[in-house]
Amino acid sequence: MPEASTSAPRQATVTRKTSETDISATLSLDGTGTSSIQTGVGFLDHMLTSFSRHSRIDLAVICKGDLEVDDHHSVEDVAIVIGSAILQALGSRAGIRRFGSALVPMDESLARAAVDLGGRSFAVVKAEFGRPVIQGMSTEMVGHFFTSIASGLKANIHIAVLDGHNTHHMIEAMFKAFALAMKDAVCIEGGGIPSTKGVL
């Protein structure tokens, strides 16, 4: 299990060390979108930098993984740790908007994302890519990234590529749509716990 500590409201640091990966992630939900990403997987670094910028979540990630095997463990565990850190930073989730959605074009590509931070882990990812690998990241791991972050975050995430043929553009549109959906979902609106049950 990840070990977590909150250093200030809406901030968290989470670490996870296994025989496969050694990861630390620090973030602030009320940031400006600054980031420092070192996962060892070039394309994942690029996508997480974009996620940070467009969600306005300050994010620092360091991962040492068994890339001599492949990228699976690093991508999966980085997603789990980031999701866990966001969950810790949210605290009781009192006053958050909870839901967020976005539609993002990138040239010929179009992606849609919807998020519910209601405590139910589930992910649906619909995308087909023409390239098996891009900058060290297996494209089959894109869907697994979102499934894993949903698990760590205890969130319901739906992401779909609606159009496109350039693999880079399609995946980047997905991450940007997810970022904008998260930006909405984590924002503070007030009004207590956003659930008729009274808890999340």
From Swiss-Prot:
Transmembrane segments: none annotated. PROSITE patterns: IGP_DEHYDRATASE_1, IGP_DEHYDRATASE_2. GO terms for biological process: L-histidine biosynthetic process. CDD domains: IGPD. It holds the Pfam family IGPD. It catalyses: D-erythro-1-(imidazol-4-yl)glycerol 3-phosphate = 3-(imidazol-4-yl)-2-oxopropyl phosphate + H2O. GO terms for cellular component: cytoplasm. It comes from the Bacteria. Keywords: Amino-acid biosynthesis, Cytoplasm, Histidine biosynthesis, Lyase. GO terms for molecular function: imidazoleglycerol-phosphate dehydratase activity. The keyword Amino-acid biosynthesis applies. InterPro entries: IGPD_sf (IPR038494), ImidazoleglycerolP_deHydtase (IPR000807), ImidazoleglycerP_deHydtase_CS (IPR020565), Ribosomal_Su5_D2-typ_SF (IPR020568). Pathway: Amino-acid biosynthesis; L-histidine biosynthesis; L-histidine from 5-phospho-alpha-D-ribose 1-diphosphate: step 6/9. The keyword Transport does not apply. Belongs to the imidazoleglycerol-phosphate dehydratase family. HAMAP family: HisB. This is Imidazoleglycerol-phosphate dehydratase.
